[in-house]
Regions:
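Beta1-alpha1 glycine-rich phosphate/pyrophosphate-binding loop at the start
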Residues: 6, 11-77, 176-196
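A Rossmann-like FAD-binding core segment of flavoenzymes
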Residues: 93-96, 100-111, 118, 181-278
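Flexible, glycine-rich terminal cap/loop adjacent to redox cofactors
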Residues: 9-37, 42, 49, 53-54, ...
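Beta1/beta-strand and adjacent pyrophosphate-binding region of the FAD-binding site
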Residues: 1-12, 157-167
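Glycine-rich dinucleotide-binding loop and its adjacent helix/turn
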Residues: 48, 127-183, 187, 216, ...
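N-terminal Rossmann-like dinucleotide/flavin-binding domain of flavoprotein oxidoreductases
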Residues: 2-4, 42-120, 197-220, 345-347, ...
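Rossmann-like dinucleotide-binding cores of NAD(P)H-dependent redox enzymes
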Residues: 40, 73-79, 83, 152-153, ...
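FAD-site-proximal beta/loop scaffold in flavoenzymes
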Residues: 141-157, 240-317
Length: 441
């Protein structure tokens, strides 16, 4: 049996970063990855990097086939770089295969050439998440039905794209494919569009999408999916929709089933997520879990912060925990992007705080005029007693950069006036934070 001080399952952000750190500290490390197409993890191969590359090229009105080619070039470069960052280190063995727990120290790795057993003093799970496929008749057997990974590898642009699910992934793909020139229809089962956002923000997003030619159908309860005359037929209670391709955007769930975590005494919840404490220990005392597999926020920067927590315990003072996280921002890379941090207005009012809500139309921002995109709105919620920012929603060009400035002020516990009176370059989108927070009375 091959013995290692650390065995890491999954080549994601936390896993690959931890592998390098431990190897540099002198540990003997094995990293197990079930697919050589996933070196580097979800973000590089089927998530952030390929989608944002396509979003960029769609905004430039690049030919779809050429955009797919460039996306592949970017992904292949980063995948190869990530592989060699680990494989070329003397203390790391990269092992291809699917890992399965035998017990809390031993793993069986299923490989085409024969199984391999590995022993790890400490084991770290970073297997990520996988697409949820709703139990709709025909969804797994009908040609032209894709998850996000499949859609990223299309050979030609669909004339009409249907999207089953109106969440953030659905919105991002809808905006992207509309920019490439597809007709897009979003089918959302709920009666409310983007329920986690304030209604004014969600309404602005819906208007922007509709102006791009995207149809949004709410209360769309799909009963079955079929194929007819080279099109996907989507059958719902009151209507039928024919599309050239259908994206299933119904969320993602932790990828744990094939691990058989129960063999190692690892508890999972009802969604298959590995149960962890504030320092990411599982219920097996020598095993940790990091990233999407824990069922928390599915962002690569959360996976990276999970790595920091584990690194601090193994090589540092052991003081870091998930409690250290304050305000976690996120961005939806539609065109223009939505970025948010902290509370919504609805959440702030429900908390009982004495608040002010201010909004600024993007059309009032000089830089937006320069960039010829005046769509959207900036919104902030301020606590009248503490003068601190409780939350912000930025729907505008470059919001994915601006939101990090707001987050830093919030995390530092500084008053909103810091942004009101800050000196920013001109003309820039960030200087609009001066104007937004000048509206606070």
């Amino acid at each position: 049996m091959n013995k290692y001080q650390a065995v890491i399952i999954g080549f994601g952000k936390a896993g690959k970063t931890l592998a390098v750190t431990l190897a540099k500290a002198g540990w003997r490390v094995a990293l197990i990855e079930q697919s050589n197409a996933m070196y580097g993890g979800t973000c590089i191969n089927i998530g952030c990097i390929p989608t944002k590359t396509l979003v960029h090229d769609a905004q430039q009105h690049t030919d779809f086939v050429r955009a797919i080619q460039r996306k592949n070039e970017v992904v292949n470069f980063l995948r190869n770089k990530n592989f060699h960052n680990l494989a070329d280190m003397p203390n790391i063995d990269v092992i291809d295969g699917q890992a399965e727990f035998i017990n809390n120290h031993s793993l069986r790795v299923h490989r085409p050439g024969g199984n391999l057993e590995i022993h790890g003093e400490k084991i770290f799970i970073n297997t990520g998440a996988q697409a949820v496929v709703p139990p709709i008749p025909g969804i797994t057997t009908t040609p032209g039905v894709y998850d996000s990974t499949g859609l990223l590898n299309l050979k030609e642009l669909p004339g009409h794209l249907g999207i089953l699910g109106g969440g953030y992934v659905g919105v991002e793909f809808a905006s992207m494919f509309a920019n490439f020139g597809s007709k897009v229809t979003i089918l959302e089962a709920a009666s409310l569009f983007l329920p986690r956002e304030d209604r004014d923000i969600a309404d602005n997003i819906a208007t922007i999408l509709r102006d791009q030619g995207v149809d949004i159908i709410l209360n769309a309860h799909v009963e079955r999916i079929s194929h007819h005359e080279n099109q996907v037929q989507v059958h719902s209670e009151h209507a039928q929709l024919a599309v050239d391709a259908l994206l299933i955007a119904s969320g993602r769930q932790p990828a744990t089933a094939s691990l058989h975590p129960e063999n190692a005494g690892i508890a999972v919840n009802e969604r298959g997520a590995i149960v962890v404490d504030k320092q990411l220990h599982t219920t097996a005392d020598n095993i940790w879990a990091m990233g999407d597999v824990t069922g928390g926020l599915q962002f690569t920067y959360i996976s990276l912060d999970d790595y920091r927590i584990v690194r601090d315990e193994l090589l540092g003072e052991g003081r870091r925990s998930t409690d250290d996280r304050k305000n976690v921002p996120y961005s939806v890379f539609m065109t223009p992007p939505l970025s948010r941090v902290g509370m919504t207005e609805e959440q702030a009012r429900e908390s009982g705080a004495d608040i002010q809500v201010v909004t600024l139309p993007v059309a009032a921002i000089p830089r937006a005029r320069v960039m010829n995109d005046t769509r959207g709105v900036l919104k902030a919620i301020v606590d009248n007693k503490t003068q601190r920012i409780l939350g912000a929603s930025l729907l505008c060009v470059d919001s994915h950069e601006m939101i990090n400035i707001v987050k830093m002020v919030m995390d530092a516990g500084l008053p909103y006036s810091i942004l009101r009176d800050q000196i920013f370059t001109h003309p820039s989108m960030s200087e609009s934070l001066n104007d937004l927070f000048s509206l606070v009375k």
